[in-house]
Amino acid sequence: IFALLIALVMGLGAAIYFSIFIALMGVLLALTPIAAQLYGADRYAEIGEEVRQSAWLAVALGAACFALLRYPDPFMALTRLPPEVEERARGYLWAASWGVPAALLFRVFYGFSTAVSRPRVVMALNLIGLAIKIPLNMVFMYGQLGAPELGGVGCAVSSSVIAWVSCLLAWSWCFLAPGYRRYHVFARWSWPDARRLAHI
């Protein structure tokens, strides 16, 4: 019964989460062709500005997704689930919401790196995340190493942790790696530019 409850919570929570997340993530995919065009034209310094604006967009979309996942009443009203399952599904979405801003910022790095022909970095980070995901699931789902036993909610907790780890590693690499310096991502501060954001 416990295993069935975990499956129900994860299935419902993941369905709601990915429905919202993928819709918002699709907006950020526009960075890749924009940056790739600038890369092909050797206009490297301009790529940094596009990345900074995309990061602002990711923050805004992340805030919207964060709010939707923490107040999922419209979605729950459609499910008509037993109260116990609904409560746990809300817990799953609450835990997952913490990782959304980091996951979207990582997608900006993903699109940027892909555009400038550096996909290996992204692949390496994804593999690191996958390697961490399995033991973290065991820790949070089944209460290992002194952690509370969270069941399906623990899967969302581990996903949020990995999202932040991946995001921090990605942008630290972008800051430190010599191969990224010519794009001037960290050369200066940029406030949101409505014209550029509309273009993205």
Please report, for each region that a protein language model flagged, where it lies by residue:
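Helix-terminus/linker motif at the lipid-water interface of multi-pass membrane proteins
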Residues: I1-V9, M76-P83, V139-L150
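Small-residue hotspots at the loop-to-helix junctions and early N-terminal turns
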Residues: F2-A15, A89-L93, A156
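Small-residue-rich hydrophobic transmembrane alpha-helices
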Residues: V9-F66, R70, A103-V122
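Hydrophobic/small/kink-forming positions within alpha-helical transmembrane segments
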Residues: G26, F66, L130-A131, P135, ...
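Short alpha-helical transmembrane segments in multi-pass integral membrane proteins
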Residues: A35-P101, A147-I200
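Alpha-helical transmembrane segments of multi-pass membrane transporters/permeases
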Residues: A58, F112-V139, V153-S160
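Alpha-helical transmembrane segments of multipass membrane proteins
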Residues: P74, V108-F112, P135-Y142, W171
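Transmembrane alpha-helical segments of multi-pass small-molecule transport proteins
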Residues: A95, G99-L104, N126-I134
